[in-house]
């Protein structure tokens, strides 16, 4: 999930939000995407776990500070952030 030839890495952001509803989450994701694009940060993936009242986002950026700034600008305080995450989505055939 890294851009080759750059120092970008992936960050897992967690937001704990009671009463997550799809319409509100869609609005937040749209806002995060717009702010991230303007800041040269990529929002790669979002996951919602309603039973845990948690929204997860995976961002690619040059620094943790850039991700935190994007989240703040979008109006969402980061509850937890983990640097250097990697993900593999889907299976590859052999």
Features from the language model and the residues they span:
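Short S/T/G/P-rich N-terminal loop/turn motif that feeds into the first structured element of a domain
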Residues: 1-38, 86-94
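Residues in well-ordered beta-strands of folded domains
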Residues: 14, 44, 82
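Residues that cap or initiate secondary-structure elements
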Residues: 19-21, 52, 63-65
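Short, glycine- and small/hydrophobic-rich beta-strand elements in well-ordered beta-sheets
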Residues: 33-55
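Short C-terminal domain-edge/linker segments immediately following a structured domain
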Residues: 42-47, 75-78, 87-92
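Short hydrophobic/aromatic beta-strand micro-patches
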Residues: 58-60
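An amphipathic, aromatic/His-enriched active-site/gating alpha helix that lines ligand/cofactor pockets
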Residues: 62-87
């Amino acid at each position: 999930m890294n851009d080759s030839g750059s120092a970008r890495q992936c960050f897992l952001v967690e937001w704990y939000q009671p009463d997550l509803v799809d319409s509100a989450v869609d609005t937040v994701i749209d806002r995060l995407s717009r702010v991230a694009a303007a800041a040269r940060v990529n929002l790669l993936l979002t996951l919602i776990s309603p039973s845990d009242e948690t929204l997860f986002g995976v961002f690619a950026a040059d620094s943790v500070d850039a991700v935190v700034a994007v989240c703040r600008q979008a109006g969402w305080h980061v509850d937890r952030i983990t640097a250097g995450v990697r993900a593999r989505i889907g299976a590859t055939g052999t």
